[in-house]
Amino acid sequence: MQPTPSQHPVGAQPLIARPATGIIDPNTGRPVGADDPFFLNVNRELSDKGFFVAATDDLITWARTGSLMWMTFGLACCAVEMMQLSMPRYDAERFGFAPRASPRQSDVMIVAGTLTNKMAPALRKVYDQMPEPRYVISMGSCANGGGYYHYSYSVVRGCDRIVPIDIYVPGCPPTAEALLYGVMLLQKKIRRTGTIER
C-alpha cells in the first residue's frame, strides 16, 4: 500500500518552504527597503492595529502609480529607444509600466519623434480617446521643441502646442535609462498631485 501525500514515512520531515525574505541587499544583508520610513510606518501601524488606515485618494493614487498602461506615439528615431525600454535589460513592466495598443486602455502616451503639422490632428485625436486621468511624456528633442527640424515649415515646435505634456525627456535620442527616469518622475508626480484633483 502506497502512502498518500498527506502521510509521511516514519522519521521523514515534511518539506516546508522557508518564509519569503524579499530581495536581500548584498551590502547590508537586510531586505531592500527595510530602512524606508514609509514601510517602517506601515509595519508599525499593522503591528499595532492589525489593519491599515488610508484615505481613498491615497489608495487610488497608489494603485494608479503601480499600474500605468502606456501607448506609443512613435514618429521617428526616438521610438527605437522607446522600444528598448520594454526589452529584458530594462523591463519597464517591473515598475508597473505595461504597454497597451489602444488609447482607450492607456493612461500614458509617449510621444517620440518629430511631430509634423499633418500629424498634429492625429495626435490630438488619439489623446482625446484616452480616459481621464491621462498623462503625456514628450520624448526627445524633436518632440520637446522641434529639435533639429525646429525651423522647418512643416514641423510643430513642440508637442505641448497640441497636447498638455507632463514629463519632458531630453536627448537626441534619449537613452532608455532617461525614459525610465521620466517614467519614475511621472509616478512621483502622480503620488504628489493625486488623481482626483487632476
Swiss-Prot record:
Keywords: 4Fe-4S, Cell inner membrane, Cell membrane, Iron, Iron-sulfur, Membrane, Metal-binding, NAD, Quinone, Translocase, Transport, Ubiquinone
Cofactor detail note: Binds 1 [4Fe-4S] cluster.
Principal cellular location given in the protein's record: membrane
Cofactor: [4Fe-4S] cluster
Gene3D superfamilies with a match to the protein in the record: 3.40.50.12280
Pfam families given in the database record: Oxidored_q6 (PF01058)
Compartments in which it is found: Cell inner membrane
MF terms (GO), sorted A to Z: 4 iron, 4 sulfur cluster binding; iron ion binding; NADH dehydrogenase (ubiquinone) activity; NADH:ubiquinone reductase (non-electrogenic) activity; quinone binding
Signal peptide: none
Highest taxon of the lineage: Bacteria
Family membership: Belongs to the complex I 20 kDa subunit family.
NCBIfam families cross-referenced by the UniProt entry: nuoB_fam, PRK06411.1
Assembly mode: NDH-1 is composed of 14 different subunits. Subunits NuoB, C, D, E, F, and G constitute the peripheral sector of the complex.
Protein name: NADH-quinone oxidoreductase subunit B 1
Native source organism of the sequence: Rhodopseudomonas palustris (strain TIE-1)
